[in-house]
Amino acid sequence: MATKFPKFSQGLAQDPTTRRIWFGIATAHDFESHDGMTEENLYQKIFASHFGQLAIIFLWTSGNLFHVAWQGNFEQWIKDPLHIRPIAHAIWDPHFGQPAVEAFTRGGASGPVNIATSGVYQWWYTIGMRTNQELYTASVFLSLMAGVFLFAGWLHLQPKFQPSLSWFKNAESRLNHHLSGLFGVSSLAWTGHLVHVAIPAARGQRVGWDNFLTTLPHPEGLTPFFTGNWAAYAANPDSANHIFGTSAGAGTAILTFLGGFHPQTQSLWLTDIAHHHLAIAVVFIIAGHQYRTNFGIGHSMREILDAHTPPAGGLGAGHKGLFDTVNNSLHFQLGLALASVGTICSMVAQHIYSLPPYAFLAQDYTAQAALYTHHQYIAGFIMCGAFAHGAIFFIRDYDPEQNKGNVLARILDHKEAIISHLSWVSLFLGFHTLGLYVHNDVMQAFGTPEKQILIEPVFAQWIQAAQGKALYGFDFLLSSSASPAYSASQSVWLPGWLDAINSNNNSLFLTIGPGDFLVHHAIALGLHTTTLILVKGALDARGSKLMPDKKDFGYSFPCDGPGRGGTCDISAWDAFYLAVFWMLNTIGWVTFYFHWKHLGIWQGNVSQFNESSTYLMGWLRDYLWLNSSQLINGYNPNGMNSLGVWSWAFLLAHLIYATGFMFLISWRGYWQELIETLVWSHERTPLASLVRWRDKPVALSIVQARLVGLVHFSVGYVLTYGSFLIASTSSKFG
């Protein structure tokens, strides 16, 4: 008899109910729980899967390149990046009538196309690509690389090529390779590409495989490097009237510190970016060589951590025992990695609009809005994952004996103080922020808007002034020509930076007022509440006052009856589940704020945000309702336009979102009754009764139904806002 799914769990494979299928899918990636899994095999499986992950990323990027080269308008877009819409790919749909064909035929194309809102055109243009042929070449190269990585993944699963457990746990060697190799050398290589290919291309000089070894990126070659005259590489930068992609106004500098933006492209100076990557390379290559590997010199991570003991004795054992705790727990390591990547992802969202690195990206408003929203939502999901794996660490990997008295144990010991403080902050922020908003709404409703409580964000304005924003009149640090900070950099990067920060045609340090003050605190409420739920879930994962033996029940468990006081909604998984709703809520406020604020700036009408953002009806009426009208009329009884697809996606997203509630509100008994009824009717229906199944149908567990609900809620939520965002922005700016 054929073995049933799942092969990795004989217990589940023999389950006579449909639970076998759903639990099999749910635990497919929980390698630790699989039959016969050893620690060494676990590490090897995860290591090999990384190659598959890289192959997928390369194939995906390859597909982007290929479709733009085949069906896009890259070469036309380069000639006029501000007025030609970049095409992502063609669309072929048998349902299109003539109006749809005409509506979606854009960007100089001969048939229906999708417009790219991801900024890839600007990225490829900035790094030196100029022709479709180069896009094809890159696409083929990445496809081949994907094949190489798939082979490498397979190879590392073969017994001869499987790394040993000691190899995976050699922390110092890993730091050496990751810091020096992954970050350092790749940054150096990228600096090389920018200096040898991208900067010449920005000055109208083509460098390809045929001439890159003979074309000097700087007139003096390597002479200044070897003679110590490094300043030569910063001399003669591009002038303020440089036209990107041509030699008009171009200089010869390759590594500069100009500050600010290129006046034409409104992006960072490429020579500044090259300088930045070179500095990163030097720092990381040195950093990666600090640790003791083969030669008996350098730091030992274990010694460093064990030495970190607060001297007075009042703070316990410090970092003692942490080396083994971290090094032996994949969940701890994954939690740290996810927390770092989540933070970085959110930072990318902030920086890609405030300091745009790619030429002309700042003027592609739809791409700006899409990139910001995309990175903030991804950051939110990743950060929630960090706490989920932190909780799993406490349940599966934490050893109280090994961590006696250290910082980890002490955090668990005073978790009540941490949780209650977060709770207090959340309550304070919630009541005060909502109180201010509601007061202002009442004043608007009663016709006395002058009685609103409007608070200027003076501390934030002071911080902006310290960076050089002169508008507020604070005479401080970079806003004061008498300060040492001002004079120290006056001859280097400061003129460019001050021009940028005091200019009204970019997004650097936007002017802020009472509306910003309120929404800032609303976002702070969301962040603190999300953090409260996640931190409580992780710190209570092993046990709480109500359920001291929680760790024996694992990460996710359903209700355990009234006998123990009721254990519904207290597993670490439940905390993750609840936190995702708050995370989505928070990112919603963040993206609303970003988008509405920028719509005003891009349209030259900042007063609308300033006046309407101080009360809730302003947000609902002047942001959401006002900007959804074009979207909702993408198709109606009179016809359709190019927003029709987003109107449809908007509707679809609402349906997905609503489906989520069906799973979230009903409990297990409902599903069991529903399934029994369906089975009964199925078995009594002609023809349908011929189809039998071996597994006895049982309802979703509470946890499963909640997961299904959560996924539908999340997907619907993000897709609803995504379609609103792209439609409302592109309808205004093309």
From Swiss-Prot:
One GO cellular component term: chloroplast thylakoid membrane
Keywords: 4Fe-4S, Chlorophyll, Chloroplast, Chromophore, Electron transport, Iron, Iron-sulfur, Magnesium, Membrane, Metal-binding, Oxidoreductase, Photosynthesis, Photosystem I, Plastid, Thylakoid, Transmembrane, Transmembrane helix, Transport
Membrane topology annotation: Multi-pass membrane protein
GO molecular function: 4 iron, 4 sulfur cluster binding; chlorophyll binding; electron transfer activity; magnesium ion binding; oxidoreductase activity
Stored HAMAP family: PSI_PsaB
Family, as annotated: Belongs to the PsaA/PsaB family.
This protein's name: Photosystem I P700 chlorophyll a apoprotein A2
Gene of this entry: psaB
